[in-house]
Amino acid sequence: MMAADMIESCIKRTLQAFEKWLQKGGKSTDYMVPIGISAMINVVIDAKNQSLKLCAVDGIDVHQYHTKIDEFLEKVSQQMIRGLVQKLISVLENVLGKLARYDEGSVFAPIFNFTSQINISKVLNPASSSQNPPANELGLSYVNFIRANLEIFHQKINDELWILGLFEYWYTQTMNAICDWLTDRLDLSLHPYQMTCLGLIVKKTYSEFEIQGAPEVCLRSKTYQTIYARMQMEEANVHLKMEGGTGGERMFPARGEENDY
């Protein structure tokens, strides 16, 4: 009982510190999860692994009180996942907010249309335009943000199952946020810059989380399929407006034609 009390007290302090850490840092794509956050996650993971040894005899709980510490630790673990993903999603929301400036009817869209004629082939074939500024720098910066933080989690967190749970929730919330953003624009056609950036984000988010082992049932959720169908339509519109609707590789090909999205 004393061991359980000590664990609970320690984890409560750890959670308080964790929540304070999440309040630090901005919402830009330069954000990288601090080592301190990973360390506190590992404290909870280690406590879960050690609680059975400390609060049981011969691997059998001697009192129901001791099983409560396991429930408490699981609750804290899930709370950490939700809090961390909320922080990560705030970066995506910041990116989506910037893309919203290009909405039809906004004061920015005509300016950007005048200053740059975006060619979607620069996104699909970046090597062919390596001497020019990227047409989707905001999308690229977000993809780099995802990759950097995925790597941090793999290097700094000690439990693969915990990491997988984090990744599944992060991916799901990412697709939910993107789908909501698109739903708010059902009556609007996406600006070419919105299309190229968002298309890259959707495509690379899928592939990065697929590499990390996210299950197909999570990756190809109904939300993702809704996004995919919308992006197919928007991409077709961009090709039609800018290339006459002929030729060009597609980021969102018809089902059965895709190789890697």
Indicate residue ranges for each PLM-predicted region.
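Extended alpha-helical "rod" scaffolds
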Residues: 3-261
